[in-house]
Amino acid sequence: MNGYGSPYLYMGAPVSQPRAPLQRTPKCARCRNHGVLSWLKGHKRYCRFKDCTCEKCILIIERQRVMAAQVALRRQQANESLESLIPESLRVLPGIGMTAGGEGNQAAPPRTEELELRWSSPEPQAAPPTCAEATEDTEEVSGGENGGSSSDREQDVSSPEGSKPNSCYTPEPPETPSHPEEARYSLPKADNSEKQPKAESPPRKYPVSPAEQSVLIEGLGGSINLPFSLRANRPPLEVLKKIFPAHKPPVLELILRGCGGDLVGAIEVLLSSRSADGSAHPHADPHPDTLVVPSNGHLFEHTLASYHPVSSSAKWSVGSAFRVPETLRFSSDSSAGVVSSTPLGVPMQHSPFPQHTRYPLMLRNSLTRSQASPFVHNDVTLWNTMALQQQYQLRSAAQYVSPFSPARSGGTVFRSSPILSPRPPEEQRVSLQEESCTLGPKPGLYSPEEEYEERSDSADSRIINASS
C-alpha cells in the first residue's frame, strides 16, 4: 500500500471481451502532474500536493483563475437573460419569492438584506469549484491539465474552512462582502439593489397561503416562484369596472357580451364612444350613467345600439338590422334637420319625403323603466335609425330606372302615395309622439295586395318627376 492517497486505480490485465465505454470520471490534476492517478471526488482535502508550488502547479493555479472568470461571466449572462424574460411588473409583485428568500436573519441591516439572495457566489476562487458540473466542464473542455485546475479550485475553496457538499444552488447565509470583488460578483448588482428588498420584504408582511399555486422557473443562477394569481387573470368585467368606473356594470357587461368576451375590443369601443361623445356630439348626454339599458341583451343584434343615443355608424355592427348609412347620419349642426333639446323632442326632418309611423315604437316599455319621460335617448335613437332606414331605401330606389316597369304619369301616383305625401302640418308631427307611445300594433299603411304595386308606382313616379 503506497501513501499516495485513497482510493487507488489499479490497472489489470486486458480483458478478453470488450467492455462498454464507461463515463469519464474526473481525476486530480496535481496528482497527475506528479505521476499519481487519484479520483477527484472526496480527494481534494487529502491531496498531498495541494500546497505544491512547482511550475506545473502554478500553471494550474493561473488556468484555474481564468476558467473561474469565464464561468462567472457565463453565470452572470444567464442571470441577466433570466431577468429579461420576466417583465418588470412581475419582479415587484409581493407574491414573487426567490427560493433562497426568507432564510437569512430578519434583523440584519439593509446591506446584509440585499446580499441575502445570493445564487452561488461567482467569486473567482469560490463558486465554480463547488459544483461537480463545473468540474466536469473544466475536465472535458481543457483536457488533463484543466482537470487539475478544477481540483485546485476545490482545494483553494475548502482547505481553510473544511469540506462542503456540492452547493451550486443552495443559498449561503448572508454576509457582508470582504472586498469589492465579491461585492461586484454578488447577485444584487447596481440595478437590482433597489428591487431586491421589494421582492423580499413583502412576503413577510403578507404571507402566502400554502394552498396558493405557483410556477417555478429554474435557471442557471437560481429559481423564481411566480404565483398563478396574477393581476392578469382578473375577470374581464372587473377590469372594465376598474378602467371605466363612471359606467354602470350592466352597460359594461352588455358591451363585453356584444364584443364576444373580447376585453381589448370592449375597451376600444368604450374609448371610441367616449371620444365621439366629446367631439362629434356635444348635444349628447355627458353622463353615461343616466342611460337606461334593457335588462336582457337580445333586443338588438349588437349591444352598442342600446348604449349611446346619437352615434356614428362606425359603432353599429355591419350585419345589424338598425344600421345607419354613413351618408344619412344626423349631425348637430346640419341645417336639414332641427333637433329639439328637450327630452320629449323627436328630431323632425324637413326632407322631401316626410316620415310617418311606418315603424311604431314597440320596444319602448322594454327600453325604459321610468314613466316620467315617454322618450329617452334609446327610443329616439331607435326611431331615428328606422326612419332613416326607410328614407335610405326610398332614396336608393329613386336612383335606378327599372327597365321592366312601365312609365306612368307621375302626378296622380305621386299625390296618392301615402309615403310621398306633401309636408304634414305641425299638429300632425307633434301628435306623432303621443301616437307612437301606444303598445298595440298599428295597421300597415299598405294592404298586402297593394303594397308591391304602390311601392313600384311611387318609385317610378319619383323618377319621372325628377327627370322632368
UniProtKB/Swiss-Prot annotation:
The keyword Nuclease does not apply. Its main location: nucleus. Probable transcription factor that plays a role in configuring the spinal circuits controlling motion in vertebrates. Involved in neuronal specification within specific subdivision of spinal cord neurons and in the development of a coordinated locomotor network controlling movements. May regulate transcription. Coiled coil: none annotated. Pfam families: DM (PF00751), DMA (PF03474). One of its GO terms (biological process) is male sex differentiation. GO terms for molecular function: DNA-binding transcription factor activity, RNA polymerase II-specific; metal ion binding; RNA polymerase II cis-regulatory region sequence-specific DNA binding. Transmembrane segments: none annotated. Residues 28-75 bind DNA. Belongs to the DMRT family. The lineage of its organism: Eukaryota, Metazoa, Chordata, Craniata, Vertebrata. GO terms for cellular component: nucleus. Keywords: DNA-binding, Metal-binding, Nucleus, Transcription, Transcription regulation, Zinc. Residues 234-269 form the DMA domain. This is Doublesex- and mab-3-related transcription factor 3. It is found in: Nucleus. Residues 191-203 have a biased composition (Basic and acidic residues). Residues 157-169 have a biased composition (Polar residues). Residues 96-210, 408-468 are annotated as: Disordered.
